[in-house]
Each structure stands twice: as structure tokens, then as C-alpha cells.
């Protein structure tokens, strides 16, 4: 069983590399544009391959158009990749949009915005360390006067 999993993983990795090369070099369809193959998940019997792709577009309508173009070109892409790989049966390609990259960029932008807001507040009101040090200095002065009485 472990050997079978290892083989499917190796095939998935090779398929990902070959798909990336085919989509970058051999595909001349302007509807697809620049596409990144993030991952490939191959079924255990090697009959299907789910291909996770991303586009550098944020508009959902444009992304859907590009995904539809990939889906319609899947049989042609499959024949191009089959010529490069030595498999008895080439898996049927199913393209799926992977939004994890877009979500990661969105989260990174949110974190950057919060950091910038914190820096602006720190410059406006002073840092929390300065406020704490001033408070400690004030308590030390009052403690000294109590000890002298």
C-alpha cells in the first residue's frame, strides 16, 4: 500500500511539472493567459487528476473565464502531457481554481495594514514602553517620599 501511495505522489509531482511547462510554453490560447499550477492530486487508480491552478487576476468573472478556457482545452492539454510522460493510462485532467494564494495575499495585506496603523498610533501617542516607564518613575518618586517620613 505504501508503495502505491509513493507512486501516485511521484506521478502527481511529475504531472505538475509537465503541466506547468505545457501551459507556459506550448499553449497559445490567449484566453488562458498566465497560469500557475499549484498542486496536482491523482486518484489511486490514476484515472483522474485534479489540477489546482491560480491566475494573477482578482476579478471573479475573469478567473471563471480563464478556468472555463482551461477546462475546454483539457483534452488537448492531456494529449500534450501524455506525449511527455511514459504512462500506460494518462489521467483525465480536472482543473480547479485554488484561491489559497489570493487569500494568503489578502491576509498578508491585512497584517501589513494593522502594523502600519500600530506604527501611526505609536508615533502619535508614544510607545507603550515609554508610557510604562513614565508610570514606574512616578511610583518610584512617591515611594521615596513615604520612606522619608
Curated annotation (Swiss-Prot):
The gene name reads rbfA
Q: Where is this region: Disordered?
A: 125-149
| UniProt keyword Cytoplasm present | yes
Per the record, the GO terms for biological process are: maturation of SSU-rRNA
- Compositional bias of kind Acidic residues: 131-143
Give the superkingdom in one word: Bacteria
What family name appears in the similarity comment?
A: Belongs to the RbfA family.
Subunit-structure text: Monomer. Binds 30S ribosomal subunits, but not 50S ribosomal subunits or 70S ribosomes.
Q: Does the keyword Cytoplasm apply?
A: yes
Chain ranges passing through the membrane: none
Q: NCBIfam families from the xrefs?
A: rbfA
Q: What function does this protein fulfil?
A: One of several proteins that assist in the late maturation steps of the functional core of the 30S ribosomal subunit. Associates with free 30S ribosomal subunits (but not with 30S subunits that are part of 70S ribosomes or polysomes). Required for efficient processing of 16S rRNA. May interact with the 5'-terminal helix region of 16S rRNA.
Q: Which UniProt keywords apply?
A: Cytoplasm, Ribosome biogenesis
Kindly list the GO CC terms recorded for this protein. Answer: cytosol
Gene Ontology terms, MF aspect: ribosomal small subunit binding
Chief location: cytoplasm
UniProt name for this protein: Ribosome-binding factor A
Query: Where does the UniProt annotation locate this protein?
Result: Cytoplasm
According to its UniProt entry, this protein's organism is Shewanella sp. (strain W3-18-1)
Query: Pfam families in the record, alphabetically?
Result: RBFA
